[in-house]
Swiss-Prot record:
Species per Swiss-Prot/TrEMBL record: Solibacter usitatus (strain Ellin6076)
Cellular location(s): Cell inner membrane
Entries under Pfam families matching the protein: Proton_antipo_M
Designated name of the protein: NADH-quinone oxidoreductase subunit N 2
Transmembrane domains' residue ranges: 16-36, 45-65, 87-107, 119-139, 141-161, 176-196, 219-239, 258-278, 285-305, 313-333, 340-360, 385-405, 421-441, 464-484
The keyword Translocase appears for this protein: yes
HAMAP family: NDH1_NuoN_1
UniProt KW keywords: Cell inner membrane, Cell membrane, Membrane, NAD, Quinone, Translocase, Transmembrane, Transmembrane helix, Transport, Ubiquinone
Amino acid sequence: MIDFSLFYNSTDHFSIIPAVMLALFGCAILLFDFLIFPDPRQRKFLLIFVVLAEAFTGFGLFRQQAWLAAQNAPELSGFGGSVTVDGFAIFFNWIFLVAAVVVAIVSYKYLEISGEHHGEYYSLILFAQCGMYFLATGTDLITLFIGLELMALCFYVMVGFLRTERRSNEAALKYLLLGAFSSGFLVYGFSVMYGIAGSTKLSDIAAAIASRPPWDPMVFLALSTTSVGLLFKVSAVPFHMWAPDAYEGAPTTVTAYLSVASKAASIAFLLRIFLGPLASARAVWEPLLAFIAIITLTIGNLAAINQTNIKRLLAYSSISHAGYMLLGLVAGNDTGIKGIAVYVMVYTFMNLGAFLVIIAMRRASIIGEDLDDLAGLVHKSPGYAFLMLIFLLSLAGIPPTAGFLGKYYIFLALIQTGHTGLAIVATLYVAVAIYYYFKIVRSMFIREEMEKTPMLATSFGLRCALALTGIATLAIGIYPEPFLRLAQTSLFR
């Protein structure tokens, strides 16, 4: 008889309950869409499955959090250490859950206007989130790669979801080809790590690399090839080329999900690798990462200046935000890692909010993605105009919005670790960002409306999502203490 207890114990299923819930409900949506709801008018009920999936996922995360607190344990390991649930993983998974819920509830009306199918769309949201779960909890190269590819494959399909639009198809193809190319580098880097340690466990790899000099050729090869794959996922320069096309070509709801959840998952993945296996090689990667962060800030901010398509402008803005997060990793102290966590949290709300306003602009004949589409918005829909103003001020890092808090901790960490020059340069780019964000503000508040078209009636879900993101963006900036305590739990140990 085979003793399965050698391979499976009672904590294994507990460590992946949220992922199991997401996968089961994702499959259930596909089955119900095909067998139970063939009539397009019935497909609105599929959204209920997404809400239930997120409710069960949230309950699973809460139970894991409660177990760690009750046991006074720093982490919960499953499957022989391949999955580790700790404060870091739970924090990021709450971010994924919020992003998925917001995107799902605003997608119903958007899909109706676009004339696209609902079933596979909602399933892809859940399957992508399932992949993100393993990116945040994975402590084994195989687990991390499976999570990454599950997430990436879902986004390849979602970016090209508008099958009748050429730009959507082109964006998906470019994203797929470049994504596959970067995954090749990542796998090669993983294979070098396995060759160094003889194990796929991150802890074993960290010990093996620590026993070698930082400039060891094999360590440098593993670092350089792995970094290509990781930096592509966070859209850092020079691996950012896919982001503007993918953001512009994808459905706006997908762009919102991609810009927030995918970036948060990729940041979690990057932290797992750089603060785990590659931590002892900091002398090598810190100056390289600092250079890449500054170049990312430069290209992202300067390229955004001349954009007239709002989604493309926000794509370059997203690239620059990746640069700020990388600077937190360059600092590398507790303040820096806490700063990254705070930045990811506030970026989720303010960037989602900005894209939600774009979604609200969608009318029967106007997509609502160009600056001209927002002209005179304050006269037609002052609520949307002022919400967009709040989100843009936050993206620029202006107090008392949440965005200021994220940048403050990044800059503080840089100064604490002696990187004052980097902090000064990063601060200068805030001024550049204010300039191109003001282009949108100018269009909404100063320019006259170019075409007298009535606003499309927005759904209740969209109004709730806008209220949530707007309140969160202001609340985190005005009363940050509870949110800072939440970010403190995410410190990587």
